[in-house]
Curated annotation (Swiss-Prot):
GO terms for biological process: translation. Keywords: Ribonucleoprotein, Ribosomal protein. The keyword Ribosomal protein applies. GO terms for cellular component: cytoplasm; small ribosomal subunit. Residues 84-110 are annotated as: Disordered. It comes from the Bacteria. The lineage of its organism: Bacteria, Pseudomonadati, Pseudomonadota, Alphaproteobacteria, Hyphomicrobiales. Coiled coil: none annotated. Belongs to the bacterial ribosomal protein bS16 family. This is Small ribosomal subunit protein bS16. GO terms for molecular function: structural constituent of ribosome. It comes from Rhodopseudomonas palustris (strain BisB18). The keyword Thylakoid does not apply. The gene is rpsP.
Amino acid sequence: MSVVIRLARAGTKKRPVYHVVVADSRFPRDGRFIERLGHFNPLLPKDSEARLKLDLDKVKAWVAKGAQPSDRVARFLDAAGVKKREARNNPEKAVPRKERKAAAEAAAKK
């Protein structure tokens, strides 16, 4: 059983609120879950304390048991100092394609 810590959408249309839950990875996103760990309201300002509420003791216990956080939850845990998130390295994304690079070099020579 692969256990993940992820966001489950709640709220109404165009007014999302997310529950931070522990669930089996095979369960639907908004379906069954094992335990609720907190909630996240993206509509509140970023500096608001009510934007994200987590029970850090429960989160630490689930991470110790091997639960894998989703990408967004990993960002939350990194900000809270619970689990370090490794920075992504994608150096090829910013490199221009060969044709554009050649065209830019030709334009620079003129």
